Amino acid sequence: MIDFIQRVVVTQKSTMLLESERYTFDVDVNLSKTDIKTLIQDLYGVQVVAVNTHRLPRRKTRFGGVKTRTKRAIIRLKNGDTLPIFD
């Protein structure tokens, strides 16, 4: 299950969203919003209120190739809940 979460996104925007209990992850492209919600709730034991997703554009590599597209999920938790990886 944890293989579906590729990485935790740490950008300026994602750190600003941490104050309002929103966490940003890069996830597997084939996951739906309900799959992401149940995955986070089962892994961390928190209550997920909303999941927003968007697909990032492909990036060109240096020598004539492209990197695959990824899906980014912004997860909003119930007030008072936090993820242990950010403590």
UniProtKB/Swiss-Prot annotation:
Q: Read off the SUPFAM superfamilies from this record.
A: Ribosomal proteins S24e, L23 and L15e (SSF54189)
One Pfam family, please name it.
Answer: Ribosomal_L23
Q: Which domain of life is it from?
A: Eukaryota
Query: Can you name one GO molecular function term for this protein?
Result: structural constituent of ribosome
Q: Which terms in the GO cellular component ontology are assigned? A: chloroplast; ribonucleoprotein complex; ribosome
- Tagged with keyword Chloroplast: yes
GO process terms (BP): translation
Which UniProt keyword terms apply here?
Answer: Chloroplast, Plastid, Ribonucleoprotein, Ribosomal protein, RNA-binding, rRNA-binding
Q: Where in the cell is it found?
A: Plastid, Chloroplast
Xref: PROSITE patterns: RIBOSOMAL_L23
Subunit comment: Part of the 50S ribosomal subunit.
Purpose = Binds to 23S rRNA.
Supply the PANTHER family for this chain.
60S RIBOSOMAL PROTEIN L23A (PTHR11620)
Q: Which family does it belong to?
A: Belongs to the universal ribosomal protein uL23 family.
By what name is this protein known?
Large ribosomal subunit protein uL23c
Q: Which organism is it from?
A: Ostreococcus tauri
